[in-house]
A protein has these predicted regions:
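Active-site regions of enzymes building and remodeling cell-envelope glycoconjugates
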Residues: 1-10, 17-20, 119-132, 185-188
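A nucleotide-sugar donor-handling region in carbohydrate enzymes
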Residues: 6-74, 79
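Catalytic donor nucleotide-activated moiety binding site of glycosyltransferases and closely related
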Residues: 73-81, 90-137
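Short, solvent-exposed loop/turn segments at secondary-structure junctions
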Residues: 78-82, 114-116, 156-158, 174-177
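Hydrophobic/aromatic ligand-binding patch that stacks against planar heteroaromatic rings
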Residues: 99, 142-143, 160-163
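Nucleotide-sugar donor-binding patch of glycosyltransferase catalytic domains
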Residues: 159-228
């Protein structure tokens, strides 16, 4: 006759977990380091392919290409009530859209999910909006993959860009007044010194350790176009 199997007491589970945390040596600030790029790099992955895992299905790529072609640049906006300091500077992106259009490329707006169902500030942009990107992750990823380049601010859907092979530039990697976007946080939890890139990023992928002001975004774009 088999004996009943009971889970270990909660105190034992907690003790084992704490023993592991103390044993690893790479962890800082208790459990929070589990969620950091620094922990993942040290304990599991040294090769880039492990993190560049997001890809769009073939049928989604075909749908997006038929609708938008491939001569476009996406702009993923953030317009959220949570930590509004991290939101996109719409004035900057107005100018960016005009500049992109002057280069013969189509700017495609990917709105913030919350904003899409509330204030809809993205309508101020007066450029094509990829409505399908709001509810279909495959189509959103296909938009990124088919694009000449992808522009965004940190947060929101930017992890899709970070964990893919598509070309991108993510602005506001640091934001004054937001602890999780501070240089200290990136150094302590992601192993990044100011201005550095994540170890698995490609040449065509950039983190901008500055605000998305008109001057900064335009300077980055002009440099990007000059080096194409």
């Amino acid at each position: 006759m088999s004996l009943p199997c009971y889970p270990p007491p909660l105190t034992e589970v907690k003790s084992n977990a704490l023993n592991y945390l103390n044993y690893s040596g790479a962890l800082k600030d208790k459990y929070r380091f589990f969620h950091s790029l620094g922990f993942l790099k040290r304990k599991f992955f040294e090769y880039p392919e492990a993190f560049q895992c997001f890809v769009a299905p073939t049928d989604s790529l075909k749908i997006i290409q038929e609708k938008y072609g491939k001569s476009y640049i996406t702009i993923s906006l953030r317009a959220n009530r949570f930590q509004p300091l991290r939101n996109s500077n719409l004035q900057s992106w107005h100018a960016v859209c005009d500049y992109i259009a002057s280069k013969g490329l189509q700017p495609i707006i990917l709105p913030d999910f919350e904003d899409y169902f509330n204030a809809q500030s993205f309508k101020e942009m007066k450029h094509p909006v990829a409505h399908e990107a709001m509810l279909d992750l495959n189509l959103r990823m296909a938009l990124y993959e088919n694009a000449k380049h992808n522009l965004a601010v940190s947060g929101g859907a930017s992890p899709l860009l970070l964990c893919s092979k598509v070309p991108y530039s993510i602005f506001k990697w640091v934001v004054s007044g937001i602890s999780s976007c501070s240089p200290e946080h990136h150094r302590n939890f992601n192993g990044l010194n100011f201005g550095e890139k994540v170890w698995f990023m490609r040449v065509s992928q950039s983190l901008i350790w500055a605000d998305d002001s008109i001057d900064i975004v335009m300077m980055h774009l002009k440099n990007m176009f000059d080096n194409v």
